[in-house]
Amino acid sequence: MSTNGVMEKGFVTTSLDSVINWGRTGSMWPMTFGLACCAVEMMQAGASRYDLDRFGIVFRPSPRQSDVMIVAGTLCNKMAPALRKVYDQMAEPRWVISMGSCANGGGYYHYSYSVVRGCDRIVPVDIYVPGCPPTAEALLYGIIQLQNKIHRTNTIAR
């Protein structure tokens, strides 16, 4: 959290936006939307080696308790309405991470009749994590980039 003022007589001045965004970045709760092999790497990121809990990231089973959705894997036309429904059930503010080349743009199955060519055609995506499948480190880097994006937003002006 950045301080905009100087410390005088035991207090620090800062903006309310900075405090709210600091709280949001320290308690991101992702809704997992694992569709293919990228979901295995997402599960690995939550395991003890990478331990996303230390960043305040706790996977939630319900979209109503989540503020981040991680779309991992190939999105088919049949699954697209379910993705949109889960996204609409999430409370504002909400963010989406697209994980893997299949979620980003269709991947190997780009020319298949049943594959959506990127989940950004269904929901707005904030962070794209490339790779097939992306490593747990790449997902962790994407989450850190999302935290940086949240720090830069104006919360109260929305």
UniProtKB/Swiss-Prot annotation:
Entries under Pfam families matching the protein: Oxidored_q6
InterPro entries xref list: NADH_UbQ_OxRdtase-like_20kDa, NADH_UQ_OxRdtase_20Kd_su
Family per similarity comment: Belongs to the complex I 20 kDa subunit family.
Keyword Lipoprotein applies: no
Free-text comment on the cofactor: Binds 1 [4Fe-4S] cluster.
Gene responsible for this protein: nuoB2
Coarse class of the protein's main subcellular location: membrane
Protein name: NADH-quinone oxidoreductase subunit B 2
Location(s), subcellular: Cell inner membrane
Cofactors: [4Fe-4S] cluster
Matches recorded under SUPFAM superfamilies: HydA/Nqo6-like
Enzyme Commission (EC) number: 7.1.1.-
PROSITE patterns, A to Z: COMPLEX1_20K (PS01150)
Protein's membrane topology: Peripheral membrane protein
Protein's GO biological process: aerobic respiration; electron transport coupled proton transport
Listed GO MF terms: 4 iron, 4 sulfur cluster binding; iron ion binding; NADH dehydrogenase (ubiquinone) activity; NADH:ubiquinone reductase (non-electrogenic) activity; quinone binding
Keyword entries, A-Z: 4Fe-4S, Cell inner membrane, Cell membrane, Iron, Iron-sulfur, Membrane, Metal-binding, NAD, Quinone, Translocase, Transport, Ubiquinone
Quaternary structure and interacting proteins, as annotated: NDH-1 is composed of 14 different subunits. Subunits NuoB, C, D, E, F, and G constitute the peripheral sector of the complex.
Catalysis performed (reactions): a quinone + NADH + 5 H(+)(in) = a quinol + NAD(+) + 4 H(+)(out)
